[in-house]
């Protein structure tokens, strides 16, 4: 197991549910310690990043831009970020240059730093047409970089499908037409907050690419997991119902160490009391239940250690539940956040 590994949880309020002051932000605990520390207070936090080459540097995506720590999360300072009050929902480190980091925002914008997150600039707006209405602005929920074409980026949008860039984020192309076509199938129709039954397919939460199958882009959305092998022109249902009784896809991540391993967080719905983490060791062809715990809320996030494959952590909504394994899934430990903290959105470790 990697030494001096910290665990981080990002907490925010659920849409339409007021939160009490002090119950949001970033919590930190050492992997061998039972106590959580509230290290960033008052700012709702939807995304976390432990820098993969320097774990001293930790990023929090908040409702007021990017906050940065250079002491393993003991303290945070607001980065030199160009916009006030901008919600940050995702981060991506460029595999070619660890100094370059992307941040995805709501309303949709992409920001980039070329100095390890000290300062940021807003890239040209992607200009993707909104295809569904929602009680919130569209969010850039996750970004991923192609393993062998590093200028090729993909982003999962909530609620607006997928977009692709071929020039390191300067311009973007809509990749959602086939997701909308798939929504014509009875089992893939879903409408909760908008006037289109394509809403469920456009409800993108996460996106990943495994190095073992670099031309397969995997999307986690409300209707399950979907796969594209032609840069987002077409999508195929990965039929997660064959492997899991619940199929609401909230997170999908590729292992940093194993080229063929993927992890997916599946639950019943955005607001639910059950869920599980599934692992594929063949680049998404087959899946098996990985965790050995009972959650009481939707699993919102899977946190993978940058260098230690045995460490995996999950965070579930509503009861401040964090669970972790440090032995590759053989045993699991409950690590609940202090009450009344509830709505976990992100977990990370390193």
Task: Please give the residue ranges for each predicted region.
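Extracellular glycan-interacting surfaces
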Residues: 1-350
